[in-house]
Amino acid sequence: MNKVNILLTEANGNLSNSREMIINAIKTAEEYAFPKLKIDWDIDILVTNRIPMIIPENGAGGYTFSADFIRINIDDKKATKNLISENVVHELCHAARWGKNDEWTENLFDGIIFEGLACVLEAEFVKDKSEKTLFIKTILERTDKENEKILSELREQLDSNDYDYDMVFFNGNDKLPRWSGYSLGYYLVKKYLEKTNKKIEDAFADKYTEFKIAL
């Protein structure tokens, strides 16, 4: 049976008391994403509190290195089972895509779609949960009009690989709100799903060029 293999960094002892909660959180994400995305290989997940949080408010964050290796960063004072599960689901979407589609992101458009796919899966996972990360709540509350404005600001850069990643996806500026790349990706992927009559589990491994119909 394919599964996640969980490793916690415990040398400083800060995660020891949360070990059971962390494992349960990851298992919840695994039980949701593995059958939905038809993940048929093992995935190693390293959980650590040794790396500064990119989004401090979330309590948990992640980075997917490959189809079978994910790192989850947590704030052991803020992280809850729900917040960890939500982040793991997001990262499992990245891992699943790489396991079924070996395309690299070659430009800003590809990166936006890559993150948008994971945001859609994450949003579906939390839709009936009262506790959500500030990140996904912000993505879901952003209007179509606001996302169209973001698209207008970024349109000329979509085919370029020379852009400010932190500004587009995280910090924003006077014209782009925080997490613009993620919310635009969510918006475009949702449009793609509507146009193709697909569900996220049918579309997460589609070629990047196919998503151009959402523009």
Task: Provide a role label for each language-model segment.
Residues 1-10:
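N-terminal, Lys/Arg- and Ser/Thr-rich interaction peptides
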Residues 9-67:
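Auxiliary, metal-adjacent structural segments of Zn-dependent hydrolase domains
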Residues 72-87, 109:
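Short pre-active-site segment immediately N-terminal to the catalytic Zn-binding motif
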Residues 86-99:
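Active-site recognition of the HExxH zinc-binding catalytic motif
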Residues 93, 101-102, 142-143:
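Juxtamembrane/disordered regions of integral membrane proteins
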Residues 99-108, 128-137, 195, 199-202:
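Inter-helical turn/loop segments and adjacent helix faces that build the functional surface
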